[in-house]
Amino acid sequence: SILLIHEIGFDNFTFKKLGFKIGSNESSIYRYFESKHKLLLYLSSWYWAWLEYQLVIETFSISESKAKLEKAIEVVTKTNTIDSDFSHINEVILYKIIVNESSKSFLTKEVDTENKEGYFEIYKRLITRLKEMILAIKPEYLFALSLASSILEGGLHQNFLNEHFPSITNCKDG
């Protein structure tokens, strides 16, 4: 599904097209996901969990708060490379899907219900981890959550601009 979504875009993606691509019938895919929106929620959650894993691994041994936050920002805003630990997922292509399509997972009428059902827990936990690193440097900072979510979403947005509107960003590949 990742390769097909990347190839034709989420809006043009259907389970029928996926079934044709993988040599299976459409109904077999519906056994796993009731809609393409639920598939996008799953892929987004997988990505946020993988990014959280990267964040924890990369910052665990850093004791100095400023250096830890700098490394965390680097981890959550960089363009991804292949992770050989997860051979069943192409993180580079999944990252491109997240950059281009992830907002479609939460800019919906169902977002509040899906939030209550826990679909965004990993995403929120990742932002909370960043917030804690910000507060470790400046405990009295009142807007740590806003800054943390802006760092995460801003990185995605800048990478989107780099890919599609490079003349309006200073973000360059990597």
Can you describe what each PLM-predicted range is?
Residues S1-T14:
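Short, amphipathic alpha-helix enriched in basic
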Residues I2-L3, F33-V56:
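An amphipathic alpha-helix adjacent to DNA-recognition modules
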Residues D11-K38:
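Helix-turn-helix
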Residues K17, K68-K71, V75, S146-E153:
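Amphipathic alpha-helical interaction segments
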Residues Y42, I57-V92:
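Hydrophobic alpha-helical connector segments
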Residues W50, Q54, D83, E101, ...:
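A short secondary-structure junction motif
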Residues L94-A136:
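Amphipathic alpha-helical packing segments from all-alpha helical-bundle domains
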Residues K116, L135-G174:
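Hydrophobic/aromatic-rich alpha-helical bundle segments in the mid-to-C-terminal region
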